[in-house]
Every structure is written in structure tokens, then in C-alpha cells.
Amino acid sequence: MNRAEILEAAKRCVCGEREGEYGTPERNFDTIARLWTVYLNARVPDNGFRGTLLVTPKDVAMMMALLKVARISVSDKADSFVDLAGYAACGGEIAIGEGVAVDE
């Protein structure tokens, strides 16, 4: 696969297949963020933060991307690169929706 094919495969996943299965990234990542927040605060009560640790949908996108980076570090599978591109796109869309400036 070349880079264009990887990006096209990621587009098919995040704009079609996966969205049909799991809903929009914003909604799905919000659900994951809420679950991770509860889990992490219960698991690591003295987390060094003031108050409750809050995981956001953008954090979910970045942590899922890091999971793919970890997998790529031990096994080069095209699917992991496709997923990495997809998580980056979803994270970018969420960030822009939150008001991050867009370079044009």
C-alpha cells in the first residue's frame, strides 16, 4: 500500500464502515472517555492531579493512536497504519469541533 491507499482505507473505515457500526467518533469516543475516566479514577485514586482526572474524546483518539504506535513498534501490519491514520483524522475533527484553529 502507498500513502494514498492507506489514507483511502482509513477514510473508508472512519467515514463508513466503523461509523455505521459504532456511531460518530465524537459520540463513540465520548462514551469511551467517560468509561476510562471512571476506571482510571477508581484504579489510580492518587493520580497527582487536583481533583478528578478527566479523559476527553480527543484524549481517546490520541491514546488509541498511541496504542497503534505501540503495535507498529513490534509488528508492521498495514492495518495498524490505516487505523493510526483514522484515529489521527478523528482526533483532528474533534479538536477542530472544539475550536482549534485551522491553518488554511
Question: Which residue ranges define each predicted feature?
Answer:
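Intrinsically disordered, low-complexity regulatory regions
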Residues: 1-104
